[in-house]
Design a protein with these regions (language model features):
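S-adenosyl-L-methionine/SAH cofactor-binding core of RNA-modifying enzymes
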Residues: 2-60, 66, 103
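Residues within well-ordered alpha-helical secondary structure of globular protein domains
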Residues: 15, 156, 186, 215-218
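Conserved beta-strand scaffold positions in the cores of enzyme catalytic domains, especially
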Residues: 29-31, 76-78, 201
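Structured adenosyl-cofactor binding patch, chiefly the S-adenosyl-L-methionine
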Residues: 64, 68-115
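Internal, active-site/partner-interface "lid" segment
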Residues: 89, 101-141
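SAM-dependent methyltransferases
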Residues: 130-198
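A short beta-loop-alpha structural element at the N-terminal edge
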Residues: 200-214
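Conserved GNAT-fold acetyl-CoA-binding loop/helix
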Residues: 213-225
Length: 225
């Protein structure tokens, strides 16, 4: 297969940096490569904090001459373990993720600091109008107007979603003591038996004893926790 030559790439890089007023320590040349470090939100934050200029080099065909990477590239980044035709889509992902944290790009920092992965947690569920849609209703706490209760609900939902869908994120960003206490409560609540049918009220009979004991034993273990 074809390989991109080193000198044309070097000439393009020199042209891109020719008019740059950014000092070298604040510049970063990144090659989008399947062999690179996996790009994450944490990496995006680090790039935004440490550098004022990013030059993204997009490979094509079989890749680029290794000598160009050795001489000119500061680091390699990958957006995942899959194959693309070229590095352009990866460059767009990096550009969007980093630029949205630049002041003025979005109207408010809250536009991105509360989203999934920002703090190593998944975002809480979102709702809008109407209040009821196809039999599904917006949670009552969100309709009550109590901001403290809404914040508490969002925190719990964020932790529970992360626990269920992406528990690996807790290894990367360990829970705080407050989060750990809430996670313990979430686990206890999720382990409780859930009623699938309305309860039937009637006097107990002798043949109900095995079923009663079957319920009592796990209940006893739960109360001992």
């Amino acid at each position: 297969g074809q390989v991109m030559m080193a000198q044309p790439l070097k000439s393009c890089l020199d042209a891109a940096l020719a008019d740059s007023a950014v000092p070298a320590p604040r510049r970063r040349v990144i090659y989008l490569s399947p062999q690179g470090q996996t790009f994450t939100q944490a990496k995006a934050r680090q790039l935004k904090a440490d550098y004022d200029q990013l030059v993204l080099v997009c490979g094509h065909y079989e890749g680029v001459d290794e000598r160009f990477i050795e001489a000119c590239v500061d680091e390699e980044l990958s957006i995942g373990d899959f194959v693309l035709t070229g590095g352009e889509l990866g460059a767009m992902v990096v550009t969007d993720c980093v630029c949205r944290m630049v002041p003025g790009v979005l109207s408010d920092t809250e536009c991105y600091t509360g989203e999934s992965h920002w703090a190593g947690r998944l975002e809480y569920p979102q709702y809008t109008r109407p209040e009821t849609w196809e039999g599904r209703t917006v949670p009552e706490v969100l309709r009550g107007g109590n901001h403290a209760e809404i914040t508490a609900w969002r925190t719990r939902q964020s932790l529970e979603r992360t626990l269920v869908k992406r528990p690996d994120l807790f290894r990367e960003t360990p829970p705080t003591p407050d989060e750990q206490r809430l996670l313990d409560k979430i686990r206890r609540d999720r382990s409780r038996p859930q009623l699938t049918e309305p309860p039937v009220c009637r006097p107990a009979a002798a043949d109900d004893l095995p079923a009663i004991l079957a319920i009592a034993q796990p209940a006893r273990q739960y109360l001992r926790r």
